[in-house]
C-alpha cells in the first residue's frame, strides 16, 4: 500500500492469463462455450448505509461513531482481496484499504466485507482495533496499542481460508511519520505485519464460517532507525494440512537489498514461526506470491533483480525470482532469478521518472495524469490437476505497450517455458494481473485499456494526446484448461469502463488506484474483485488544464475538505472510489 510495487498472487491461486480481443465471445478450445461474467455488485456501500462491527458479525451489539460515519462519507477503497470458503462456496470474504475511517480516525484501515450469497450482497465491517474501537475484539488486539501510539493506518490486505471454516486476514499497519507507541520518536514508519483469524460463529453451520473474529498475531515489527519497512504481504492457507504460509517484503530504501521474509503457522494461525529470509542472492525484491503444490510443496515467486549490493545498481536486470520448499515451508532452497523481463511501469509515461502524475505540484512534463502501476509481478499459481506452476507478469513491449506474459513449469520450478503473451491485443495496456487455480482451471484477471479510443503505446491508459483522461479501463478474465500452456479467449468482467485517473489523493491533486485486484476460486465457483470509479463525481477543472480528472470538492473550486486524510465530512462523491465484484461462470 505504501511503497513502490504491485502485490502478489495467492495461495490456492494460479495463473494470470488472457487470450483474445476486446469483447471476444469465441468458444474455447474443444468447443466449450467461453466463460461469462455476472452482474457487477458494489461491495463497499458507503452512502446511506452503515458498517457493522466485528462484534455484530458474531451476534453481538457493539457499534460506534466510526462505523456510522463509514456508511455515509463516500470515501475511497482500493487494493481489494477476495477469498471463497472451501466448505461453503456461497460464503465470500473480501478486504481493502478502506478510507472510510479518515473522518473519525485520520487514516485508512483494513476493511472486512462478508457475503453469504456468493457475492450477490455484502455486509461491510472493519478489522478490529481501528482508532476509536472500544469493543472487546478491538481492545484485545495487539494492534490497539500501536494505534494508540500513532500507527493508525493499515493496508495491503490479503485473505485465505483453511478447510475448517477459518479465514486468515493478513496486512500491515503503520503511520505516516508520527510516533508509533514504541519508539517515542517521529518518522517511524512502523510497517508491522500481522495475521488476523476469523472462525465460524456456529461450527455446525458452515454459513457462519469466518464470521467470528478470534485474534490477531504480529509476525514482524519494524525497528526504528534501521531504514526498514515491512510491506507487500501475501498469505496462503493449505486446506489439506491447516498450515498457513505468509510472506512479505522488507524494504531498505536505497541502502541495500530489499528482502523477502517468510513465516508459517502449523496450528491454524494461533502462532507463527520467526521470520526467515528466503531471498538471499537476489536484490530489488518485492511482492511475494505463494502457491502450494499437490504434496504440500511451498513455492514463492517475486519481482527481483541482479542489482548486486544495491537494488539500484547500474545494469541491474529485472525478472521473476523463485524459491521452493519440500518440507511444508520449514526450509527453502536457494533463490534464483528464474527469468528476466522488462517490467511495464507507470514511470515510462511521466517524462521525469515519476510513478504518478496529477495537478500541480504533482504535474509531469508529459502533461499526462495517471496513478502508479509499477508492481509488475510475477504472480504465481499451482495447477495441481495438471502438475504445473504458472507465473504471470506485466511486460513492456518494444513499442512501450504493456502486456501480460506467462510461463509454466512442469518440474516444480526447476525450469520454465519461454514467456508468451497471455491475451495478445493490438491496442491498449494490460496491468495488475492476478491468478488462482481450482479444479484443473487456472483463472486470471487484470486491468485492460484495449477499449481506449485515444490509445497510444507512449501514453498512459485513458489519456489522450492533449492530456485529457477518460473512462476506458475494464477488468478482463481468461482461463487455462491445460495448466497454463494455452489460454482461452478473454472476456470483459466490468459492465462499464472506469477512469482510473481521478485525482482523489494528495489534496485531490493526484490519483491512486491501488496496486492490485484479485480473482478467487473454489471448485467451479469463481469471483473477481476490483477497484472501480464509476460512482466518483467529477468536477470542472478550474486550473485550466482540462484533464478530466478533477473531482467534486476540489479546493480549486471551493472545496473545504481538501485532503484525503483530513478529518472532515465530505459527501460530495468526489472521493467515492469503491470495490466491486462479479461472479464468473466457467
Q: Could you say what each language-model-derived stretch is?
A:
Residues 30-586:
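C-terminal PAP-associated
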Residues 2-29:
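Secretory targeting and sorting signals
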Amino acid at each position: 500500500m505504501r511503497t513502490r510495487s504491485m502485490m502478489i498472487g495467492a495461495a490456492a491461486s494460479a495463473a494470470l492469463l488472457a487470450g483474445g480481443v476486446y469483447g471476444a465471445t469465441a468458444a474455447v478450445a474443444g468447443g466449450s462455450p467461453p466463460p461469462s461474467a455476472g452482474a457487477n455488485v458494489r461491495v463497499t456501500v458507503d452512502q446511506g448505509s452503515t458498517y457493522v462491527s466485528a462484534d455484530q458479525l458474531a451476534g453481538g451489539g457493539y457499534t460506534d461513531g466510526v462505523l456510522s460515519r463509514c456508511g455515509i462519507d463516500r470515501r475511497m477503497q482500493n487494493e481489494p482481496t477476495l477469498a471463497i470458503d472451501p466448505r461453503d462456496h456461497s460464503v465470500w470474504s473480501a478486504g481493502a484499504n478502506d478510507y472510510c475511517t479518515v473522518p473519525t480516525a485520520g487514516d485508512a484501515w483494513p476493511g472486512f466485507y462478508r457475503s453469504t450469497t456468493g457475492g450477490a450482497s455484502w455486509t461491510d465491517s472493519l478489522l478490529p482495533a481501528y482508532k476509536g474501537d472500544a469493543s472487546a475484539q478491538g481492545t484485545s488486539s495487539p494492534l490497539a496499542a500501536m494505534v494508540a501510539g500513532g500507527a493508525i493506518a493499515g493496508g495491503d490486505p490479503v485473505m485465505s481460508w483453511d478447510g475448517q471454516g477459518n479465514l486468515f486476514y493478513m496486512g500491515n499497519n503503520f503511520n505516516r511519520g508520527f510516533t508509533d507507541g514504541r519508539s517515542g520518536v517521529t518518522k517511524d514508519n512502523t510497517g508491522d505485519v500481522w495475521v488476523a483469524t476469523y472462525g465460524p460463529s456456529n461450527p455446525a453451520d458452515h454459513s457462519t464460517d469466518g464470521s467470528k473474529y478470534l485474534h490477531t498475531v504480529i509476525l514482524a515489527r519494524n525497528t526504528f532507525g534501521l531504514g526498514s519497512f515491512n510491506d507487500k504481504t501475501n498469505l496462503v492457507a493449505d486446506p489439506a494440512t491447516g498450515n498457513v504460509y505468509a510472506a512479505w517484503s522488507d524494504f531498505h530504501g536505497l541502502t541495500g537489498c530489499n528482502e523477502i521474509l517468510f513465516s508459517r503457522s502449523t496450528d491454524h494461525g494461533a502462532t507463527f514461526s520467526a521470520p526467515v529470509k528466503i531471498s538471499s542472492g537476489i536484490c530489488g525484491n518485492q511482492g511475494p506470491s505463494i502457491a502450494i503444490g499437490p504434496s504440500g510443496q511451498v513455492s514463492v515467486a517475486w519481482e527481483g533483480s541482479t542489482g548486486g549490493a544495491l537494488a539500484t545498481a547500474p545494469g541491474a536486470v529485472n525478472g521473476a525470482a523463485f524459491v521452493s520448499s519440500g518440507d511444508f515451508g520449514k526450509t527453502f532452497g536457494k533463490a534464483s532469478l528464474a527469468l528476466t523481463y522488462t517490467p511495464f511501469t507507470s514511470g515510462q509515461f511521466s517524462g521525469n521518472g515519476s510513478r504518478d502524475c496529477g495537478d500541480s505540484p504533482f504535474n509531469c512534463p508529459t502533461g499526462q495524469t495517471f496513478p502508479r502501476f509499477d508492481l509488475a509481478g510475477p504472480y504465481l499459481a499451482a495447477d495441481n490437476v495438471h502438475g504445473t506452476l504458472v507465473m504471470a507478469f506485466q511486460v513492456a513491449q518494444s513499442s512501450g505497450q504493456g502486456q501480460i506474459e506467462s510461463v509454466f513449469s512442469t518440474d516444480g520450478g526447476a525450469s520454465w517455458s519461454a514467456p508468451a503473451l497471455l491475451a495478445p491485443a493490438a491496442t491498449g495496456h494490460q496491468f495488475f494481473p492476478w491468478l488462482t487455480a481450482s479444479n484443473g482451471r487456472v483463472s486470471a484477471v487484470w486491468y485492460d485499456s484495449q477499449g481506449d479510443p485515444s490509445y497510444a503505446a507512449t501514453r498512459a491508459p485513458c489519456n489522450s494526446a492533449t492530456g485529457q483522461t477518460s473512462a476506458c479501463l475494464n477488468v478482463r478474465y481468461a482461463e487455462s484448461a491445460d495448466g497454463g500452456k494455452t489460454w482461452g479467449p478473454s472476456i470483459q468482467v466490468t459492465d462499464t469502463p472506469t477512469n482510473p485517473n481521478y485525482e482523489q489523493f494528495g489534496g485531490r491533486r493526484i490519483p491512486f488506484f491501488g496496486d492490485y485486484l484479485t480473482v478467487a476460486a473454489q471448485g467451479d465457483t469463481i469471483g473477481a474483485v476490483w477497484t472501480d470509479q464509476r460512482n466518483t463525481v467529477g468536477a470542472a477543472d478550474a486550473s485550466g488544464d482540462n484533464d478530466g480528472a478533477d473531482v467534486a470538492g476540489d479546493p480549486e473550486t471551493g472545496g473545504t475538505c481538501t485532503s484525503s486524510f483530513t478529518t472532515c465530512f465530505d459527501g460530495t462523491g468526489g472521493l467515492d472510489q469503491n470495490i466491486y465484484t462479479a461472479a464468473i461462470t466457467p
